[in-house]
């Protein structure tokens, strides 16, 4: 095929429903789906929730591959600050937030600080 991996951004490619359709189409053609994640903790949480419901990618070798998730570590003052509990990784593992909705709670005071 023309590609082995696709990386749509959940927040820019139509949201959770559209990206699920993209992931299903990718799986039908044996293409790995890894979301591109850039922006705030809200987008990070959305992409994590999407990845949590996708079946494991099984490449042509028929050995299921562990999920790969882009986790940006560049300085970004807003990304984690707007979450009451930041999403972090430890030893290459990210805990998926398990609260209602996306699993996160927005820090409204932080939103006020960053409001233009």
Which residues does each predicted region cover?
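C-terminal extensions of enzymes
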Residues: 77-116
């Amino acid at each position: 095929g023309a590609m082995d991996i696709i990386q749509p951004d959940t927040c820019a490619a139509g949201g959770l429903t559209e990206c699920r359709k993209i992931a299903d189409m990718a799986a039908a053609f044996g293409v790995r789906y890894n979301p591109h994640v850039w922006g705030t903790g809200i987008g990070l949480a959305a992409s994590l929730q999407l990845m949590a419901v996708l079946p494991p990618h099984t490449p042509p070798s028929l050995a299921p591959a562990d999920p790969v998730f882009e986790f940006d570590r560049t300085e970004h003052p807003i990304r984690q600050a707007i979450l009451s509990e930041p999403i972090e990784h430890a030893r290459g593992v990210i805990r998926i937030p398990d609260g209602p909705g996306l699993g996160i709670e927005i820090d409204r005071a932080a939103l006020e600080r960053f409001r233009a």
